[in-house]
């Protein structure tokens, strides 16, 4: 296993830690996180989760950079990278929606988009074609990561001024999700629905 793949695996491990941190009933077992009354009040639980999410998100850029720089791009690495990306962002979005910290429509749109795009990629792979990433998809991922980070930090410092930057970014990411899904379909529609020879 090369270094970029190890970094990708680290992202998966951090995702599991995040899920446990956000879902485990610490209060029920006598563990209570302090809340810091700074810019609206943030629980230490979410501060830690936010820091872990930032580190995990950065590994997404680091593993790709190292793989390209050192010519260590492998099929296993690409597969794990895609799984790690979806697991990190989608799991946190679903948890935050379940805790009423973000709108439930956000993970619904993002997850449905991923299902559609993955179906297109699988269809293409079955016909020997690799579907390249597109600009709107990359922008969607970056916007999602920033918006999710802000949501974990309870929209600080913008919450203090009543500006819901986390919600704005996440809804922009939803729009980009839809746009990128449509673009993926348009680019690959002839592959999905080949024209029959007359």
Label every model-predicted segment:
Residues 1-198:
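Alpha-helical transmembrane bundles and membrane-interface segments of multipass inner-membrane proteins
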């Amino acid at each position: 296993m090369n270094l970029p793949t190890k970094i990708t695996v680290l992202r998966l491990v951090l995702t599991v830690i995040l899920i446990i941190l956000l879902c485990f009933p610490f209060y029920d077992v006598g563990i209570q996180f302090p809340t810091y009354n700074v810019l609206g009040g943030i629980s230490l639980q979410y501060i830690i989760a936010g820091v872990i999410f930032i580190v995990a998100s950065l590994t997404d850029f680091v593993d790709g950079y190292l793989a390209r720089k050192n010519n260590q791009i492998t099929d296993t690495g690409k597969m794990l990278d895609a799984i790690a990306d979806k697991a990190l962002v989608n799991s946190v979005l679903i948890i935050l929606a379940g805790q009423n910290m973000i709108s439930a429509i956000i993970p619904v749109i993002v997850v449905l988009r991923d299902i559609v795009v993955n179906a297109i990629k699988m269809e293409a792979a079955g016909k020997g074609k690799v579907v390249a990433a597109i600009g709107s998809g990359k922008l969607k991922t970056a916007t999602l990561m920033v918006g999710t980070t802000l949501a974990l930090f309870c929209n600080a410092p913008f919450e203090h001024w009543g500006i819901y930057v986390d919600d704005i970014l996440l809804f922009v990411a939803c729009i980009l999700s839809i746009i990128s899904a449509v673009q993926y379909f348009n680019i690959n529609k002839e592959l999905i629905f080949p024209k029959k020879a007359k």
